Swiss-Prot record:
Disulphide bonds in the chain: none
Protein name: UPF0102 protein SUN_0231
Family: Belongs to the UPF0102 family.
Gene Ontology MF terms: nucleic acid binding
Pfam families, A to Z: UPF0102 (PF02021)
Source organism of this protein record: Sulfurovum sp. (strain NBC37-1)
Amino acid sequence: MRELPKIFGDKSEDLATLFLEQEGFIVIERNYFARKLGEIDIIAQKDEVLHFIEVKSGKADFDPVYNVTPDKLRKVINSAHYYMKSKKIDVSFSVDALIIRGDEVEFIENVTL
């Protein structure tokens, strides 16, 4: 039976959260929606740096890393700025991607356009 995309996405974000916590990150928020700008899958902190993390996963032949597009990164960056401004936070930050391929997790820190 085929998993519904929302359920599969939630399971992937649960796995991503567990991975980040095991790596010493403190997860602050999940699925943060920044008005009309977009959504950030996970906001976490480690070593005085705030991380805005896009989670991509897949089961098929297509590598989910290719779903981290320039358009998606712009939305995450704009949402990150909105988050920090609305919370009055002024710290170093990083936009990252966490790629899940089956049971393999790849963390790509400081993704740029």
